[in-house]
């Protein structure tokens, strides 16, 4: 039997350096990735190194609220 439907949830990862640069208006935009995570394995906020096309380098992308 299934233990629950809400184990895997869809999350949005946002570039942390673009958010900081947005105050200075240096960046052309904010990079965002959509992915899924398992709530039982990772209950805390997820942070991954992904490529940011606005910064032109790999940066830390953190989970944001919907």
From Swiss-Prot:
Record carries keyword rRNA-binding: no
Keyword terms = Chloroplast, Plastid, Ribonucleoprotein, Ribosomal protein
Q: What is its main location?
A: plastid
What single Pfam family name could you report for this chain, choosing any that match?
A: Ribosomal_L33
Task: Name a GO molecular-function annotation.
Answer: structural constituent of ribosome
Task: Share an example GO biological-process annotation for this protein.
Answer: translation
One GO CC annotation: chloroplast
Its annotated compartments are: Plastid, Chloroplast
Instruction: Show the PANTHER family listed in the entry.
Output: 50S RIBOSOMAL PROTEIN L33, CHLOROPLASTIC (PTHR43168), LARGE RIBOSOMAL SUBUNIT PROTEIN BL33C (PTHR43168:SF2)
Which family is it part of? Belongs to the bacterial ribosomal protein bL33 family.
The cross-references to NCBIfam families, in alphabetical order and at most eight, read: PRK00504.1 (NF001764), PRK00595.1 (NF001860), rpmG_bact (TIGR01023)
Q: What is the name listed in the Swiss-Prot or TrEMBL entry for this protein?
A: Large ribosomal subunit protein bL33c
Q: Which organism is it from?
A: Arabis hirsuta
Identify the taxonomic lineage of the organism of origin.
Eukaryota, Viridiplantae, Streptophyta, Embryophyta, Tracheophyta
Q: Gene encoding this chain?
A: rpl33
């Amino acid at each position: 039997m299934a233990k629950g439907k809400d184990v895997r949830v869809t999350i949005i990862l946002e570039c942390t350096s673009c958010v900081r640069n947005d105050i200075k208006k240096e960046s052309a935009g904010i990079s965002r990735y959509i992915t899924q995570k398992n709530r039982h394995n990772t209950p805390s906020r997820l942070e991954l190194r992904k490529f940011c096309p606005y910064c032109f380098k790999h940066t830390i992308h953190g989970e944001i609220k919907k």
